């Protein structure tokens, strides 16, 4: 599937680039239903132009040229004329300007004088004036006055007052901020207009009452003691115990994993990658699949492995689709052992298979779902890796753990087996043959993948959501890529693919 998407990207980028390069033609265009050839100059000559007057007065020199559904002013030598301005207007304008400047200067001077007067005033005098207006000094010749009797209960707002609230109430009862009242000595502090409501000591008592447990001095001391001294000791003990537990668990897991790996290595030491009996030296590396047997599910955790490597957890829809294609392994007959193994096992049977190599190629792009990040990485340059190493060999050999293009028999030419019927025609065969000759792919391209590639290019908006995302990505690439840069990047590959340089990819 990665090959299908790569080639779809390359084909559509080349088509858009060549269309953009051949867009600015200077030749006249042919009408769709007529043999008449016309250019822009011919059309201008056919449309009659006439001169219109702007006004009905014959002395007016302004004229308009009407034609081609446009109107523009004609250039005249006497279009701009100098109008004499009376002296009275000039004198009045100068007088208004001078008066405005004088008023602005006067306002600025007033502001400067005010700032200078405020600058000399000391701060202490201002504070003394404010304090003098707010309160009066106590009379030392008179005794202290008890202004409230039930203040502890009022401040605490509960049935029983705390010790610290009692102390605050004692301080609040002794009022020496003002002279003795002529009326009764006790007032109700709960009244909305009580004289004692806004006093400074009442506010202090209310601030002290905010702590609900302020009266319990022993509990408060114990809390401070734990938070300052014992808390760090407890944390150190917890971290040490947790560290020892984690280390012991890691050691136990490591010993268990090493023992399991050694047993698995001994059991798999003499086993081939795929049990293909009667393989000769000159025979293919992979035997053709048995059509009588159903595909084998070789791994059940491919979606989660791909999601972890692509840093996209949980797996998205496109990862499930890729995993569904990779998990159905019908390149060889079914193995005799268990059909479900782990794909990330260090010695698993899936490690050196072709589908694992395809998954690793998909893993190269870390932001496969992020179109903007994909574009910032200059993906057109990244596509040039398809053309690297154009040597004599079109593909890597099996020694490098890659597959070679296999010449299958005619009765099994479409591999892997598709899930639905594949329509084969001459066009598909030509595109597939030209594709294999033009590109140096890191994996073998099957005919089914070529059919999928053409389907993506033809479906466009009438396809699945994943194909729509691929088409939108291709449009972004086609808009932002310079058409002059495409021939340099893709060079002779598309010339081979097209067969003729004059033809365009539809």
Swiss-Prot record:
Domain remarks in the Swiss-Prot or TrEMBL record: The RxLR-dEER motif acts to carry the protein into the host cell cytoplasm through binding to cell surface phosphatidylinositol-3-phosphate.
Location of the motif RxLR-dEER: 50-71
Any one GO CC term of the record: host cell nucleus
Job of this protein: Secreted effector that completely suppresses the host cell death induced by cell death-inducing proteins.
Entry annotated with the keyword Signal: yes
Organism: Plasmopara viticola (Downy mildew of grapevine)
Family indicated by similarity: Belongs to the RxLR effector family.
Protein name: Secreted RxLR effector protein 134
Subcellular location, record wording: Secreted; Host nucleus
Record key words, sorted: Host nucleus, Secreted, Signal, Virulence
Superkingdom per UniProt: Eukaryota
Signal peptide residue numbers: 1-19
């Amino acid at each position: 599937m990665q090959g299908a998407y790569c080639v779809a990207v390359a084909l559509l980028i080349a088509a858009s680039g060549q269309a953009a390069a051949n867009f600015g033609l200077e030749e006249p265009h042919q009408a769709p239903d007529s043999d008449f050839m016309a250019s822009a100059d011919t059309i201008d000559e056919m449309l009659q132009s006439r001169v219109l007057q702007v006004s009905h007065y014959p002395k007016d020199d302004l004229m308009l040229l009407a034609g081609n559904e446009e109107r523009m002013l004609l250039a005249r030598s006497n279009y701009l004329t100098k109008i004499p301005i009376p002296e009275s207007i000039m004198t009045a304008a100068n007088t208004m300007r001078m008066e405005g400047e004088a008023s602005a200067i006067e306002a600025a001077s007033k502001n400067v004088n005010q700032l200078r007067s405020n600058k000399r005033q000391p701060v202490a005098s201002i504070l003394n004036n404010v304090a003098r207006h707010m309160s009066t000094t106590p009379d030392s010749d008179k005794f202290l006055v008890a202004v409230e009797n039930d203040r502890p209960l009022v401040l605490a707002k509960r049935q029983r007052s705390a010790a610290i609230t009692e102390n605050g109430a004692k301080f609040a009862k002794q009022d020496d901020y003002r002279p003795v009242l002529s009326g009764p000595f006790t007032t109700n502090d709960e009244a909305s207009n009580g004289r004692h409501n806004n006093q400074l000591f009442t506010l202090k008592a209310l601030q002290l009452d905010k702590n609900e447990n302020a009266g319990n001095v022993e509990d408060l001391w114990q809390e401070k003691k734990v938070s300052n001294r014992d808390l760090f000791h407890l944390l150190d003990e917890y971290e040490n115990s947790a560290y020892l537990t984690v280390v012991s668990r890691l050691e136990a897991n490591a010993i268990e994993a090493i023992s399991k790996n050694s047993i698995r290595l001994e059991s798999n030491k003499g086993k081939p990658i795929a049990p293909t009996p009667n393989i000769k030296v000159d025979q293919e590396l992979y035997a053709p699949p048995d059509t009588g047997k159903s595909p084998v599910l070789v791994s059940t955790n491919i979606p989660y492995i791909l999601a972890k490597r692509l840093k996209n957890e949980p797996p998205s829809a496109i990862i499930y689709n890729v995993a569904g294609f990779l998990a159905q392994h019908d390149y060889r007959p079914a193995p005799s052992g268990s059909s479900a193994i782990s794909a990330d096992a260090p010695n698993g049977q899936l490690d050196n298979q072709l589908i694992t190599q395809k998954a690793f190629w998909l893993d190269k792009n870390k932001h496969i779902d992020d179109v903007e990040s994909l574009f910032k990485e200059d993906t057109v340059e990244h596509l040039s890796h398809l053309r690297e190493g154009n040597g004599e060999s079109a593909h890597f050999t099996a020694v490098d753990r890659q597959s070679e293009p296999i010449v299958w028999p005619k009765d099994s030419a479409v591999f892997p087996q598709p899930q639905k019927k594949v329509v084969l025609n001459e066009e598909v065969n030509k595109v597939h043959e030209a594709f294999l000759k033009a590109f140096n792919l890191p994996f073998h391209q099957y005919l089914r993948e070529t059919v999928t590639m053409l389907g993506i290019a033809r479906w466009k908006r009438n396809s699945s959501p994943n194909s729509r995302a691929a088409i939108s990505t291709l449009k972004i690439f086609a808009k932002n890529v310079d058409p002059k840069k495409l021939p340099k990047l893709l060079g002779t590959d598309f010339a081979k693919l097209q067969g003729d340089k004059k033809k365009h990819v539809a």
